[in-house]
Amino acid sequence: MKRRDFCKGLAVTLAAGTLAPAAALPQAGAATALVGRAVPDDYYTLWYRSDRCGADLRHDYYYSDSLFDHPATEYDNQLALATLGMAAAADCPWESDQRYWMEGEVGRADHIRDAFAKLGFTEVQLFNYTHSLNDTPDTVGCAIARKTLVRGGRQVTIIGAFLRGSGYGAEWSGNLHAGPGSAHVGFVTAARQLVEKIRGYVQTSAKRQPLGTLKLWMGGYSRGGGVANLVAARLPAVLPQLEKKNTFVYTFAAPASLTAADCPDLQQDYDNNHAADGSLKNSED
């Protein structure tokens, strides 16, 4: 869909050792207790892996539900930074690398679970986080959660979906699966799978309770960013209640996945694609 060119923030967050010393992750019980609880000045501490330091570090990001009150076609620097924090949290923690080869729940999603809890998102679902990192499928790890609230007297549901772009082991090999044509098979395959997962999540949530106005908050870095662009372009077609003005997508260091002639169902125009200075971009380049 649209690549949010915000590498300045990426450099700030992913630079190793410059933000905070490594520390132990909070216990699951403590994270759960924080759901929906405001913190002073609306700055929340989110965790991320630092490959350079070989440790899990943390950084404070501003978040408020009011970030989604304006149309997605308006660039928001604070929302871009918050998305960066969530995209980094979607990566597998450094500590989980000790169980690199194991299947199942081994802590690969601890950072993003903690981040969702702190920001008040519930009903977390994880996709492709339980594979051994020795596996090489054309998939992408994604964590999804939702937050239903009242804004301006109307019910609103924010769907948060953040794609893993680092610490994903042999899943990286999908970056090299370019395929015989100009559409990148490794990205397109992962995107089509994820579109169905997110659609199913939204439909199931809607059966539990009315969602009101649906808003999507999505982000990803590197491979995760490339796939997020494609997913976000497709979702409004399979979720008619999701309007473009409510599709908030920021990606970082996202590779190009298609040419203009490829996969029309994964294409989108770029009149809400902005550079880091807020200027409008006219193409994905």
Residue ranges and their predicted role:
Residues 49, 54-71, 98-114, 272-278:
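Surface-exposed intrinsically disordered loops and tails
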Residues 229-233:
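Short, hydrophobic alpha-helix immediately C-terminal to the catalytic nucleophile
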Residues 110-219, 234-251, 264, 268-278:
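A conserved cap/lid and substrate-binding interface adjacent to the catalytic center
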Residues 220, 224, 228:
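Gly/Ala-rich beta-loop-alpha elbow adjacent to hydrolase catalytic centers
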Residues 5-28:
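N-terminal export signals
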Residues 251-257:
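Active-site nucleophile loop of the alpha/beta-hydrolase fold
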Residues 21-43:
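C-terminal segment of N-terminal export signals and the immediately downstream linker at the start
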Residues 42-49, 53, 63, 69, ...:
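Terminal low-complexity/disordered tails
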